[in-house]
Curated annotation (Swiss-Prot):
Name recorded for this polypeptide: Large ribosomal subunit protein bL21
Subunit structure: Contacts protein L20. Part of the 50S ribosomal subunit.
Entry-linked PANTHER family: 50S RIBOSOMAL PROTEIN L21, LARGE RIBOSOMAL SUBUNIT PROTEIN BL21M
Keywords of this entry: Ribonucleoprotein, Ribosomal protein, RNA-binding, rRNA-binding
Gene that this polypeptide is encoded by: rplU
Length: 126
């Protein structure tokens, strides 16, 4: 099953376990958020929204908040000794799609446990 969601003015085709970068969304790292603007639900019987599918949401886990690559806006007016250089970086949220939900269901998957490096075994040294 797949879904087409809209967030930040852009549309994304997602399936469970997809990892995608979207514009900044409020939410703590490791928390589960719900994306409510589902435009299409695909599968055996596709459902098209008008404009959105009623009762459908997509659950996603927030993996990270970061900044995108720097975009340089350079303007020069020839023969006028005038120029302007500005830089800009987008705020990005990295999401992992956990579930695609229909009919107003709630997410059943909680946040995943963080992986930690195992401490070296003291018994092995003996």
């Amino acid at each position: 099953m797949f879904a087409v969601i809209k967030t930040g003015g852009r549309q994304y085709r997602v399936v469970p376990e997809d990892v995608l970068e979207v514009g900044k969304i409020d939410g703590d790292v490791g928390s589960i958020i719900q994306l409510g603007e589902v435009l299409v639900l695909g599968g055996d019987t596709p459902v098209l929204g008008a404009p959105t599918v009623a009762g459908a949401t997509v659950a996603a886990e927030v993996l990270d908040h970061k900044r995108g690559p720097k975009v340089i806006a350079f303007k020069k007016r020839r023969r006028k000794h005038s120029k302007r250089k500005r830089g800009y970086r987008d705020e990005i949220t990295v999401l992992r799609i956990t579930e695609i939900l229909a009919d107003g269901k709630k997410p059943s998957v909680g946040p995943r446990a963080k992986r930690t490096k195992a401490a070296p075994a003291a018994e092995a040294a003996e």
